[in-house]
A protein has these predicted regions:
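Positively charged n-region of N-terminal signal peptides that target proteins for export
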Residues: 1-5
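Edge beta-strands of extracellular beta-sandwich domains
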Residues: 653-657, 803-804, 858-864
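Sec/Tat signal peptide C-region and signal peptidase I cleavage site
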Residues: 16-20
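Extracytoplasmic
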Residues: 667-812
Length: 865
């Protein structure tokens, strides 16, 4: 009864969140109990949206928002509208939540002035959740060459004006605007604080209706990570962003850089003086990207996980084709093993309550202070960048959680440029939010510890030792050692903080302010140790010795410890770039050697016991333990996620301990599904299985085609037996207007179209005027199976290139007596042989299919298999 009452109360609270703004309810609530994972259907993968949707595990899918990600590269995404107009229909039919990413930087697939277009997706698609804009710091106010001429990108202020309209649409229709921020130095005037200072209408909208704004930190650039975190966290805690998220990007890793001489100048390539020599350090260690996601979700309340990027090297890729039993060739896509072992597995731990997302109120209470950036910009309308009015005061993080290796104070005079690490060396101090202002009552529970305008002259903050002393009074010491360890209630987030094993090489003389060369060698041997003071457990100490890039999420209870451990990596030195064919095969992505992490419990009254299990799919781990001199030591040798429980883990340290019963329980609620879509369906022929065809072009640009929908097309050719077959689900059985878009440049082509037991022979007339124009032919066809296939066979005539097929419902099935209404849906299906014997499924050859409709009516047909 208690549990039911809690769920009822929680449901009321969730409803209240959805109704918090003055407008329609949010289509899909995002909150700590309903987190969102944005998974990309990305044009760089030439994907089949249906295949990507099918790949997402069913337990995760309700929480996923699919992101239709459009490239600014014309050859990848020639016409963004033609891509999303096709893919949105597939997502709508699947009833999965979907956003559109029209732009990275200033380059956009859509005109910033076409407001009717932006609104139309809300009107047409009940599953549409809004717009996702990435990397809003580059490419503004520039000429960009296209095949048919030059286009000029908008200014940043013009884009900000568009965002005000998108916020109003989000308010009107219950959607979101998601923006990811990734350059705190050279584009500081495009950070979240700048949204409040540079556009009065945006300020008003974010101040009064913040629920529609998702503010994400992004890791694309190789500097300024702490500033980006502080600015985005400040927007969330300060009350001008409804949600706080993370879009991790491997591009932030220092894989290589220009090779420099003793004077700090780039060394020219002797074989090509237009290029410079590169010094290679290491491929990105995948586990290093898991750390900020888990840290920020568990400690600072991020409710949105976007990506990660790069999608083509870290999420999924198109792999080798396969052949069906009846000879069709099928295109395939697959997750990378590191995506499965890190991202899918960690999200599952959020959904099962292991990793609890704290509320905004909890994060504010834990964070305690903020920095208020009160510096007035010189000219808000100028494109000239300023840093001081928009980001943190220089030196804010020094002596707190910034590594001395990362800055050392002297490489460059700009502290933000020097910040190459996102890992933190201390978990004692929470991430410091930088705010424009404290907008609402909850935000005002934060103390403004210092204003930016006063930072340099303030003796407490401008001096590292005094700043640290001030922070030590606010945040007590709960552990010792060189690991990162931070606690919220009974949860500890711990990791090895050594992102790089840096080498600093002094220059012969200072070069434009640079005093030494930084070399970013991977940490392949430096472990980190720490001793934690338990807050709930009654043993005296918990010690950890963590290998490079190891991450531990630990929950302590009075008599046990529950640990989730993560360190998945692939072999170093592979150096595969985007488009490398070797990425198609997992055999070319071997695992990294297993590393050993050690957990030591000190002060248990009796020998504890352990239980553990490997998660996901990686080499089998080995876990051993020993009990000696009052210490219980667990050795975990692994490369990948596992769960470890240390039971009977209790001692005599009971004074001052927090109670297990006071721990906040994680509550996860399944988000509501989108309403059913009743509109036009569209399917791309490049996603159909095929045999004996002239060619299947997943991206048809380089094959000379233009004006296609989706990203490609299929050359049916003229071979005997040429055929394509694709999955074409519809919302209900009935008679449909079928439109096939095609090119027939050399003459008429005749095809046979088959849906279920109905066949139509269709002539595709020769293009009237141009060999490159697309034509359409329309005809009516009954579609009885709502989850069926369409087959198109070549019959005679000239070559036809097939682009897509559209399906529009007209009315009831015409070929079946007794079906008279468009409300008839299939209840169940039975199969029989020709002797009338019931079958469990259709058999090879001829079977009888009997369909029972929900109205009580039935129809029968012969099927051939």
């Amino acid at each position: 009864m208690v549990r039911r009452l809690f769920i009822f109360i929680f449901g009321i609270l969730t409803f209240a969140v959805a109704q918090a703004h003055d407008g329609p309810a949010l289509r899909r609530v995002i909150s700590p109990s309903q987190p969102a994972w944005i998974i990309h259907i990305d044009t760089w993968n030439s994907p089949n949206p249906q295949a990507i949707i099918n790949m997402v595990p069913e337990d995760i899918k309700p929480y996923v928002i699919f992101n239709l990600s459009l490239s600014a590269t014309e050859s990848i995404c020639a016409d963004g509208k033609k891509v999303v107009d096709s893919w949105m229909k597939v997502c709508a039919e699947n009833r999965v939540w979907t956003m559109i990413q029209p732009a990275s930087g200033g380059c956009s697939a859509f005109d910033d002035d076409d407001l009717e277009l932006y609104e139309s997706y809300y009107k047409n698609y009940p599953n549409f959740l809004g717009w996702n804009y990435a990397e809003q710091f580059w490419g503004f106010d520039e000429d960009r060459e296209r095949e048919n001429g030059t286009v000029h990108t908008p200014t940043f202020l013009k884009r900000l004006e568009l965002f005000t309209h998108l916020m109003k649409f989000a308010h009107q229709y219950g959607g979101y605007l998601c923006v990811s921020f990734t350059q705190a130095c050279y584009s500081a005037n495009m950070m979240p604080v700048a949204y409040m200072k540079r556009n009065a209408e945006m300020n008003r909208l974010l101040s009064t209706d913040k629920e529609h704004f998702i503010c994400c930190e992004k890791y694309t650039m190789k500097n300024g990570f702490y500033d980006i975190e502080s600015n985005c966290l400040g927007a969330y805690l300060g009350g001008y962003a409804g949600q706080y998220g993370i879009r991790f990007d491997i591009c932030g890793w220092m894989e290589e850089q220009d090779k420099l001489d003793e004077n700090g100048n780039a060394i020219k390539d002797p074989s090509d003086d237009t290029k410079t020599l590169k010094e290679y350090y290491n491929d990105f260690p995948k586990a290093c990207g898991a750390i900020p996601i888990l840290e920020h979700v568990a400690l600072t309340g991020e409710t949105v996980i976007d990506g990660p990027e790069l999608v083509t090297t870290d999420d999924l890729r198109e792999i080798a084709t396969s052949k069906t039993a009846d000879g069709y060739i099928r295109r395939n896509w697959a997750w990378f093993n590191h995506f499965k072992n890190i991202n899918i597995d960690m999200f599952r731990k959020i959904l099962d309550g292991t990793i609890r997302i704290p509320s905004r109120e909890e994060v504010i209470a834990r964070t305690k202070i903020c920095v208020k950036n009160d510096i007035k910009p010189k000219d808000i309308n100028s494109s000239q960048n300023e840093m001081e009015p928009y980001v943190s005061p220089s030196g804010l993080y020094d002596g707190l959680y910034r590594s001395e290796q990362d800055d050392n104070g002297t490489q460059w005079p700009n502290s933000t440029v020097n910040n190459k690490w996102w890992l933190k060396v201390s978990g004692r101090y929470p991430a410091i939010p930088v705010v424009y202002d404290l907008i609402d009552e909850e935000a005002r529970k934060l103390q403004v510890a210092i204003k930016s305008s006063e930072y340099a002259s303030n003796p407490t903050w401008s001096n590292v030792a005094s700043k640290k002393a001030y922070m030590n009074q606010l945040f007590k010491q709960e552990y010792k050692g060189d690991i990162y360890a931070s606690r919220l209630e009974n949860t500890w987030v711990c990791y090895n903080p050594y992102q790089y094993n840096e080498e600093h090489v002094p220059l012969a003389a200072t070069n434009h302010g640079m005093k030494y060369i930084r070399k970013y060698w991977v940490n392949n041997g430096r472990s980190a140790k720490g001793t934690l003071k338990p807050a709930y457990n009654t043993c005296s100490q918990i010690k950890m010795n963590l290998a490079p890039y190891s991450l531990v999420h630990m929950r302590e209870y009075s008599d046990k410890l529950s640990l989730y451990m993560q360190n998945y990596r692939i072999k170093d030195g592979l150096r595969y770039g985007v488009g490398d064919g070797r990425l198609q095969d997992d055999k070319n992505l071997p695992e990294y050697a297993q590393q050993t992490d050690t957990i030591i419990v000190v002060g248990a009254s009796a020998q504890p016991t352990i239980s553990w299990k490997d998660n996901s799919d990686h080499s089998a781990s080995t876990v051993t333990s020993e009990w000696k001199n009052g210490q219980f030591t667990v050795y975990v040798k692994h490369n990948g996620p596992l769960e470890l429980t240390i039971d009977n883990c209790k001692g005599t340290k009971t004074t001052g301990k927090l109670k297990d019963s006071d721990v906040t329980a994680a509550v996860i609620e399944t988000p509501a599904a989108p309403e059913a879509y009743e509109g036009e369906m569209q399917y791309e022929f490049e996603h159909f299985d095929y045999k004996n065809v002239g060619g299947c072009y997943g991206n048809a640009w380089n094959n000379g085609f233009r004006g296609y929908y989706g990203q490609g097309c299929l050359n049916l050719g003229t071979q005997r037996g040429a055929s394509v077959r694709g999955y074409i689900p519809v919302t209900k059985p009935g008679n449909y207007k079928v439109a096939i878009r095609y090119q027939a440049s050399m003459g008429d082509a005749v095809i046979k179209v088959i849906c279920g037991n109905q066949t139509k022979q269709v002539t595709l007339p020769k293009n009237a005027s141009s060999s490159k124009e697309w034509s359409e032919v329309e005809f009516d066809m009954d579609i009885a199976d709502v989850k069926g296939n369409m087959t198109v066979n070549y019959v005679s005539g000239k070559r036809a290139v097939l682009d897509c097929v559209r399906l529009n419902y007209k009315g009831a099935l015409t070929g079946i007596a007794g079906v008279t209404t468009d409300a008839d849906l299939i209840d169940h299906v039975e199969y029989y042989d020709l002797q009338g014997m019931r079958l469990s499924a259709a058999k090879q050859g001829i079977s009888i299919k009997k369909v029972y409709l929900r109205s009580g009516k039935t129809y029968t047909e012969k099927i051939y298999k």
